[in-house]
């Protein structure tokens, strides 16, 4: 709404953007439009949340460390039940909620490890494997290993469905351009 306007970090704007250039330039309006398109799609109004979940956000990665957080992918049901002190109108999921999560803000919670796994999936055509950081532990008496990770049989965490190779290429190229073109890397 007008009280909570959404705009690009570049106050003059970037002009017409594609998904690839939107990623490369970190142009929020590209993602606002994407979020709104999902919100107003009567068949899949929570399709963006489905995409996030399909890529492993909102659930643990299975790393061999204690107390891993699952994060949160908010949706209409979550908002309705979470904000119990708010009015019924304020508890309704709206386009602003969707545009916020489209840029990773608002009520969405993801861990750095979940994002690393999502990037792993982008690099591997949708395949994600359970990450490991624990290699071995020496027994208390120092005589041998109490545990040793053998690295055999990588355990697949999930495989996100890729709609098309060209869609995946757009995202990969946008990520490449973040680093290797004059974009937000100069900011």
Predicted feature residues:
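Beta-lactam-recognizing serine transpeptidase/beta-lactamase-like catalytic domain environment
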Residues: 1-187
């Amino acid at each position: 709404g007008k009280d909570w306007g959404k705009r690009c970090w570049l106050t003059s704007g970037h002009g017409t953007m594609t998904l690839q250039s939107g990623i490369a330039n970190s142009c929020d309006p590209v993602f606002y439009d994407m979020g709104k398109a999902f919100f107003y799609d009567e068949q899949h109004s929570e399709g963006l949340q489905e995409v996030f979940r399909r890529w492993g956000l909102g659930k643990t990665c299975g790393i061999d460390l204690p107390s891993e957080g699952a994060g949160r992918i908010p949706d209409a049901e979550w908002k309705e039940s979470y904000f119990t002190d708010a009015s019924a109108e304020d508890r309704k999921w709206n386009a602003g909620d969707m545009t916020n999560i489209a840029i990773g803000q608002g009520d969405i919670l993801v861990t750095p490890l979940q994002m690393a796994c999502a990037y792993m999936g982008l690099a591997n055509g949708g395949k994600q494997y359970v990450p490991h950081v624990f290699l071995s532990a020496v027994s208390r008496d120092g005589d041998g290993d109490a545990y040793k990770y053998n690295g055999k049989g990588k355990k697949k965490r999930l495989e996100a469905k890729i709609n098309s190779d060209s869609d995946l290429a757009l995202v990969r190229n946008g990520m490449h351009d973040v680093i290797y073109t004059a974009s937000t890397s100069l900011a």
